[in-house]
Amino acid sequence: MSEKSRKTVLVVDDEPEIRKLVAAMVTQFGYAVLTADSGDHALTVYKNHKAPIELLITDVVAPGMSGPMLADKLLELQPDLKVLYISGYDNTQVVRKYVVEREHALLAKPFSAADLKAKITGLLRPEVHSTVRHAAPRGGKRAG
C-alpha cells in the first residue's frame, strides 16, 4: 500500500500502554496512525493533520473529555469520520446512544489483534456499489 493511499487512524487513550499497543496493531494492519493522550490533544492533532482521518479509535471513559464528547467534536469537523470505541466497562448507555443510534462501533477490552482488525476492516470497508451476479446456468441445462 503506498503512503498516499494509506488510510489514517487516530488512536486516543490516556493509558500509554494501551495507546501504544493499539497504535502498533493498527500500524501492522497497514494504516497510518496518529496518537493522542487526551481529547484536547486529539483535537490539536486532528487540526494539524493536513489530510482526512478515516477512523477515530478512542476509549469511552477518559479524564477531561470523554470518547463520545471527542467523537461529537470531530464529527462536527468531519461528518464522514468513522468511530470505534474501546472500553473495559459496561457501556449500556454508550451502546444505545452512540453505537446503535449513530452507527459507531464498540470493542470491549480485553480484545485480540484479530478482533481489532475485524472491527477496523468492517468500518473502513468501501461501500459496495456493484451489480448482483447470478450463478444460475444458462439454458437450464445441467452438466452430466
PLM ranges: what are they?
Residues 30-37, 45, 107:
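Short hydrophobic/Thr-rich beta-strand motif most characteristic of the beta2 strand and flanking loop
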Residues 121-136:
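The C-terminal output helix
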Residues 37-41, 66-70:
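Acidic catalytic/metal-coordinating carboxylates
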Residues 20-28:
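Charged docking surfaces used in two-component/phosphorelay signaling
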Residues 69, 73-76, 80-108, 114-121:
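Alpha4 helix (beta4-alpha4-beta5 surface) of REC/receiver domains from two-component response regulators
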Residues 62:
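Receiver (REC) domain active-site loop signature in two-component systems and cognate sites
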Residues 59:
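Active-site residues of response regulator receiver
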Residues 12-13, 36, 56:
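Conserved sequence signature across two-component system core domains
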